[in-house]
Amino acid sequence: MRRAVCPGSFDPIHNGHLEVIARAAGLFDEVIVAISTNYAKKYRFSLDERLEMARETLASLKGIVVEPVGEGLLAEYCRQRGVSAIVKGLRSSSDFDYELPMATMNRQLSGVETVFLPAEAHYIHLSSTLIKEVAGLGGNVSEYVPRSVLRRLLAGEPSANQQPRR
Protein backbone atom coordinates (compact mmCIF):
# COMPACT_ATOMS: atom_id res chain seq x y z
CA MET A 1 0.00 0.00 0.00
CA ARG A 2 1.30 3.45 -0.91
CA ARG A 3 0.72 5.65 2.11
CA ALA A 4 1.38 9.38 2.33
CA VAL A 5 1.01 12.00 5.01
CA CYS A 6 -0.22 15.59 4.61
CA PRO A 7 0.96 17.28 7.81
CA GLY A 8 -0.12 20.67 9.07
CA SER A 9 -1.77 22.60 11.86
CA PHE A 10 -4.90 23.25 9.75
CA ASP A 11 -6.05 26.18 11.93
CA PRO A 12 -8.48 26.12 10.16
CA ILE A 13 -8.51 23.76 7.21
CA HIS A 14 -9.42 25.66 4.03
CA ASN A 15 -10.16 24.96 0.38
CA GLY A 16 -6.50 25.22 -0.61
CA HIS A 17 -5.69 22.42 1.85
CA LEU A 18 -8.64 20.37 0.60
CA GLU A 19 -7.53 20.70 -3.01
CA VAL A 20 -4.01 19.43 -2.23
CA ILE A 21 -5.35 16.58 -0.09
CA ALA A 22 -7.79 15.52 -2.84
CA ARG A 23 -4.97 15.48 -5.39
CA ALA A 24 -2.81 13.45 -3.01
CA ALA A 25 -5.68 10.96 -2.61
CA GLY A 26 -5.48 10.36 -6.35
CA LEU A 27 -1.76 9.54 -6.11
CA PHE A 28 -1.70 7.33 -3.01
CA ASP A 29 -3.79 4.47 -1.63
CA GLU A 30 -4.06 6.16 1.74
CA VAL A 31 -3.42 9.74 2.82
CA ILE A 32 -3.05 10.55 6.50
CA VAL A 33 -3.99 14.12 7.30
CA ALA A 34 -1.76 14.53 10.34
CA ILE A 35 -2.80 17.50 12.43
CA SER A 36 0.02 18.91 14.50
CA THR A 37 0.26 21.14 17.52
CA ASN A 38 3.25 23.39 18.03
CA TYR A 39 3.13 24.48 21.65
CA ALA A 40 5.02 27.68 20.80
CA LYS A 41 2.10 28.79 18.58
CA LYS A 42 -1.29 30.16 19.54
CA TYR A 43 -4.24 28.53 17.83
CA ARG A 44 -7.72 29.83 17.06
CA PHE A 45 -9.10 26.29 17.29
CA SER A 46 -8.20 23.51 19.70
CA LEU A 47 -6.70 20.26 18.42
CA ASP A 48 -10.04 18.51 18.90
CA GLU A 49 -11.83 21.22 16.89
CA ARG A 50 -9.24 21.04 14.10
CA LEU A 51 -9.55 17.24 13.97
CA GLU A 52 -13.35 17.48 13.87
CA MET A 53 -13.36 20.10 11.09
CA ALA A 54 -10.94 18.02 9.00
CA ARG A 55 -12.94 14.83 9.49
CA GLU A 56 -16.20 16.59 8.58
CA THR A 57 -14.82 18.17 5.42
CA LEU A 58 -12.87 15.12 4.22
CA ALA A 59 -15.52 12.47 4.97
CA SER A 60 -16.50 12.09 1.31
CA LEU A 61 -12.94 11.41 0.10
CA LYS A 62 -11.90 7.77 -0.10
CA GLY A 63 -8.63 6.68 1.50
CA ILE A 64 -8.29 9.63 3.88
CA VAL A 65 -7.43 9.18 7.56
CA VAL A 66 -7.36 12.17 9.93
CA GLU A 67 -5.34 11.89 13.11
CA PRO A 68 -3.20 13.96 15.47
CA VAL A 69 0.51 13.71 14.74
CA GLY A 70 1.57 14.02 18.38
CA GLU A 71 4.94 15.26 19.57
CA GLY A 72 8.27 14.43 18.01
CA LEU A 73 9.82 14.36 14.58
CA LEU A 74 7.67 13.98 11.48
CA ALA A 75 10.32 11.60 10.10
CA GLU A 76 9.80 9.27 13.07
CA TYR A 77 6.02 9.50 12.73
CA CYS A 78 6.38 8.51 9.06
CA ARG A 79 8.57 5.54 9.95
CA GLN A 80 6.09 4.35 12.61
CA ARG A 81 3.10 4.65 10.25
CA GLY A 82 4.80 3.11 7.19
CA VAL A 83 4.54 6.33 5.21
CA SER A 84 6.46 6.51 1.93
CA ALA A 85 5.87 10.18 1.15
CA ILE A 86 5.10 13.53 2.74
CA VAL A 87 2.83 15.69 0.59
CA LYS A 88 3.17 19.46 0.82
CA GLY A 89 1.32 22.12 -1.14
CA LEU A 90 3.37 25.00 -2.49
CA ARG A 91 1.92 28.46 -3.08
CA SER A 92 5.12 30.28 -3.97
CA SER A 93 8.88 30.06 -4.17
CA SER A 94 9.09 31.18 -0.54
CA ASP A 95 7.10 28.06 0.44
CA PHE A 96 9.64 25.98 -1.49
CA ASP A 97 12.56 27.74 0.19
CA TYR A 98 10.99 26.98 3.58
CA GLU A 99 10.05 23.36 2.81
CA LEU A 100 13.16 22.14 0.95
CA PRO A 101 15.51 21.93 3.97
CA MET A 102 12.82 20.07 5.94
CA ALA A 103 12.25 17.68 3.02
CA THR A 104 15.97 16.99 2.82
CA MET A 105 16.24 16.36 6.55
CA ASN A 106 13.18 14.09 6.58
CA ARG A 107 14.66 12.04 3.72
CA GLN A 108 18.00 11.75 5.51
CA LEU A 109 16.39 10.78 8.83
CA SER A 110 13.84 8.28 7.59
CA GLY A 111 14.17 7.78 3.83
CA VAL A 112 10.74 9.30 3.28
CA GLU A 113 10.41 11.48 0.19
CA THR A 114 8.52 14.76 0.02
CA VAL A 115 6.16 15.34 -2.90
CA PHE A 116 5.45 18.99 -3.66
CA LEU A 117 2.12 19.82 -5.27
CA PRO A 118 1.77 23.35 -6.61
CA ALA A 119 -1.39 25.10 -5.47
CA GLU A 120 -4.10 25.87 -7.98
CA ALA A 121 -3.90 29.51 -9.09
CA HIS A 122 -7.13 30.53 -7.33
CA TYR A 123 -5.78 29.26 -3.99
CA ILE A 124 -2.24 30.68 -4.11
CA HIS A 125 -3.13 33.58 -1.82
CA LEU A 126 -4.82 31.46 0.85
CA SER A 127 -3.44 30.82 4.29
CA SER A 128 -5.17 29.91 7.53
CA THR A 129 -3.73 33.05 9.10
CA LEU A 130 -5.17 35.31 6.38
CA ILE A 131 -8.55 33.60 6.57
CA LYS A 132 -8.69 34.11 10.36
CA GLU A 133 -7.68 37.76 10.02
CA VAL A 134 -10.24 38.55 7.30
CA ALA A 135 -13.04 36.68 9.10
CA GLY A 136 -12.14 38.35 12.40
CA LEU A 137 -12.51 41.76 10.78
CA GLY A 138 -15.91 40.90 9.33
CA GLY A 139 -14.79 39.98 5.82
CA ASN A 140 -16.49 37.30 3.73
CA VAL A 141 -14.38 34.12 3.56
CA SER A 142 -17.22 31.79 2.51
CA GLU A 143 -15.63 30.91 -0.85
CA TYR A 144 -12.37 29.86 0.84
CA VAL A 145 -13.52 27.50 3.60
CA PRO A 146 -16.01 24.64 3.92
CA ARG A 147 -19.36 25.44 5.58
CA SER A 148 -18.51 23.72 8.85
CA VAL A 149 -15.37 25.84 9.15
CA LEU A 150 -17.22 29.03 8.22
CA ARG A 151 -19.82 28.33 10.90
CA ARG A 152 -17.10 28.03 13.53
CA LEU A 153 -15.27 31.13 12.32
CA LEU A 154 -18.46 33.18 12.47
CA ALA A 155 -19.32 31.85 15.94
CA GLY A 156 -16.45 33.97 17.19
CA GLU A 157 -15.78 31.90 20.29
CA PRO A 158 -12.02 31.71 20.70
CA SER A 159 -10.43 28.45 21.67
CA ALA A 160 -8.66 28.32 25.00
CA ASN A 161 -5.41 28.31 23.01
CA GLN A 162 -6.00 31.62 21.26
CA GLN A 163 -3.79 34.51 22.17
CA PRO A 164 -5.92 37.27 23.71
CA ARG A 165 -6.46 40.39 21.64
CA ARG A 166 -4.93 43.60 22.91
UniProtKB/Swiss-Prot annotation:
- The EC number(s) this enzyme carries: 2.7.7.3
Cite the record's note on assembly. Answer: Homohexamer.
- Where is this protein localized, as stated in its record? Cytoplasm
InterPro entries attached here? Cyt_trans-like, PPAT, Rossmann-like_a/b/a_fold
Q: Which Gene3D superfamilies match?
A: HUPs
Q: Where does ATP bind?
A: S9, F10, H17, G89, L90, R91, E99, Y123, I124, H125, L126, S127, S128, T129
Q: Which reaction does it catalyse?
A: (R)-4'-phosphopantetheine + ATP + H(+) = 3'-dephospho-CoA + diphosphate
Q: What is this protein called?
A: Phosphopantetheine adenylyltransferase
Q: Which family does it belong to?
A: Belongs to the bacterial CoaD family.
The cofactors named for this UniProt entry are:
Mg(2+)
**Binding residues for substrate, per the UniProt record?**
S9, K41, L74, K88
Entry keywords, A to Z: ATP-binding, Coenzyme A biosynthesis, Cytoplasm, Magnesium, Nucleotide-binding, Nucleotidyltransferase, Transferase
| Provenance organism | Pseudarthrobacter chlorophenolicus (strain ATCC 700700 / DSM 12829 / CIP 107037 / JCM 12360 / KCTC 9906 / NCIMB 13794 / A6) (Arthrobacter chlorophenolicus)
Q: Which GO terms describe its molecular function?
A: ATP binding; pantetheine-phosphate adenylyltransferase activity
Q: Which domain of life is it from?
A: Bacteria
A GO biological process this protein is involved in?
A: coenzyme A biosynthetic process
Q: What does this protein do?
A: Reversibly transfers an adenylyl group from ATP to 4'-phosphopantetheine, yielding dephospho-CoA (dPCoA) and pyrophosphate.
| Keyword flag Nuclease | no
